[in-house]
Every structure is written in structure tokens, then in C-alpha cells.
Design a protein with these regions (language model features):
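Intrinsic disorder at enzyme termini
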Residues: 1-11, 139
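Glycine-rich flavin
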Residues: 23-155
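A non-catalytic, amphipathic alpha-helix used as a structural packing/dimerization or gating element
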Residues: 8-22
Length: 155
């Protein structure tokens, strides 16, 4: 797919493409066969900030736009779907915190990704699967408190 990127975006794309070609593509195939975790690849990706692309500038991220992020993600996915998924899945955990968290929570979540960590988005409803839109639990404000109704199970 073609993207219209600014000069910074083009430079980032070239860097990610080179990294994926040299470090990810063939090596991840070998790890798929061996079943090992390619820690050194993910450590290098973390050093490059690839797991924290969506951290806003105000919390220490590079503040790239969605189009540039999409181009970088596409390049990662071309190299290896598992690598792409690992690098982007933390954003599922980050988004709700950025939307509804307080400043301290937002900074904490962003720092985890900026320091090479990972986030996880987990649903605890029976039959929850991976569709948060299908959740049945409700939270209704009752005075100063919330009344929560629903069924939960642990992952």
C-alpha cells in the first residue's frame, strides 16, 4: 500500500524496513520451527521504540501520526505476523488507559512500553473471547458508588 509520509516518517519507515529485513524476517521463521522466544529480536525492537509507537509525545513517545504508524506496522507484518502482533498488541492495553486513566496511570502505562515492557488486554467474562463489545457486565452509578452486575472468570 502507498502512504504519503513526511520526511521523518519516510526515515522511520526505511529504518523499520531495514531492521525487519535484516533482523526479523528469516530469524523469526527459525524461531517458529524451534518454538523458542527470539528475545534478542524483541530487545532490539524495544531499543528502537517499536513497541511504543503509539505512546503520545506528552508521555515521552515520539508522537507519530496514525498513517505513519500504519506504514510501520505494515512493514512489521510483512516480515512476520507474530512479530507484528507482539509489537502492536500492547496498544490494546494502552488505549483504555489513555482514554479513561488519570495522569499517573497514563504515565505508568506509557513508561512500561517505553522501557521495553508489554501490555495485555484481557477480558474476564465467560464467553468474552476477544470481543469487548460483547461484554454483558454493567456498571451503574448509584450515588457516590457504582453497582456492578455481571459474571466474571479469571484468565
Amino acid at each position: 500500500m502507498g502512504y504519503i509520509l513526511n520526511d521523518e516518517g519516510k526515515d522511520l519507515l526505511a529504518t523499520v524496513k531495514e531492521f525487519c529485513e535484516k533482523e526479523v524476517k528469516e530469524q523469526c521463521k527459525e524461531y517458529d520451527v524451534s518454538g523458542e522466544w527470539p528475545k534478542e529480536i524483541y530487545d532490539k525492537a524495544a531499543e528502537m521504540g517499536l513497541g511504543a509507537l503509539e505512546v503520545p509525545e506528552e508521555f515521552g513517545g515520539i508522537g507519530i501520526d496514525r498513517v505513519t504508524a500504519g506504514a510501520l506496522y505494515e512493514e512489521m507484518a510483512k516480515a512476520d505476523a507474530g512479530f507484528f502482533t507482539t509489537m502492536t498488541a500492547s496498544n490494546l492495553a494502552l488505549k483504555p488507559v489513555l482514554i479513561a486513566g488519570n495522569g499517573e496511570q497514563k504515565q505508568f502505562a506509557c513508561d512500561v512500553l517505553l522501557n521495553g515492557g508489554y501490555g495485555a488486554f484481557c477480558l474476564t467474562e465467560p464467553k468474552g473471547g476477544s470481543d469487548p463489545g460483547d461484554c454483558k457486565t454493567t456498571a451503574v452509578k448509584d450515588g457516590d458508588e457504582y453497582v456492578i452486575n455481571g459474571r466474571k472468570c479469571f484468565i
